[in-house]
């Protein structure tokens, strides 16, 4: 079994949904046919079932790039090759409203996990086929959908309450830059997952 997620060969599908919160896994798994709880350890809870005859899984990752990259690495060891990160984000673009769906095409690498896999010059870009499928699915379901770049960070409170930080001036200046550049939203996993997926030869 894998050291952190506690899953073994044959227990996960090629396609894996990656929420942060373990509490969301049962709700996602309920959409599968014949879902089975495979493992639970630390922040990692995994269910596997089928969709349209294809074996699929959901595995929670906790918050942030380090734990998310561990999940992707270990799931890849078990044969997973296509990942969909799902979770909450905070809007940056004024046009992104509460309840809208944001499909990330790429991410600002304002985090450090991805630096263990690629130099900072390497872009954190989503897989085109996965991005296109997600956007089409969201629109077909009738959601207000935004597609574009997101900001990926390591500190939740440092970014949401920058005025409290000793480096508030830098945080506020960069936040204004993200807005002017049309960045859609802010979250904590995408940059790491996009870069790790490229390093492993996966899709995300």
Mark where each language-model region is.
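Metabolite-binding pocket within alpha/beta catalytic cores that recognizes anionic/polar moieties
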Residues: 1-133
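Glycine-rich beta-alpha junction loops
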Residues: 22, 90, 151-157, 192, ...
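Expand to "…catalyze enediolate/carbanion chemistry for C-C bond making/breaking, isomerization
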Residues: 77, 167, 199
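Active-site rim beta-loop-alpha module in soluble metabolic enzymes
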Residues: 125-182
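A C-terminal functional module that forms or caps the active site or interfaces directly
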Residues: 174-204
């Amino acid at each position: 079994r894998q050291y952190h997620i506690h899953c073994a060969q044959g227990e996960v599908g090629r396609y894996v949904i990656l929420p942060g919160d373990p509490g969301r896994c049962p709700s996602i798994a309920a959409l599968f046919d014949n879902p089975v709880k495979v493992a639970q350890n630390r922040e990692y809870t995994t269910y596997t079932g089928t969709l349209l005859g294809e074996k699929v899984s959901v595995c929670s990752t906790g918050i942030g790039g380090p734990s998310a990259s561990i999940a992707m690495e270990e799931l890849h060891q078990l044969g997973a090759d296509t990942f969909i990160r799902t979770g909450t984000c905070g809007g940056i673009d004024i046009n992104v409203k509460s309840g809208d769906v944001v499909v990330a095409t790429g991410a600002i690498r304002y985090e450090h996990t991805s630096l263990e896999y690629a130099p900072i010059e390497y872009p954190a870009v989503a897989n085109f086929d996965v991005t296109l499928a997600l956007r089409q699915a969201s629109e077909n379901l009738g959601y207000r959908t935004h597609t574009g770049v997101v900001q990926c960070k390591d500190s939740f409170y440092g970014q949401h309450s920058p005025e409290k930080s000793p480096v508030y001036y830098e945080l506020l200046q960069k936040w204004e830059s993200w807005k002017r550049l049309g960045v859609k939203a802010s979250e904590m996993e995408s940059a790491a997952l996009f870069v790790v997926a490229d390093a492993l030869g996966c899709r995300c």
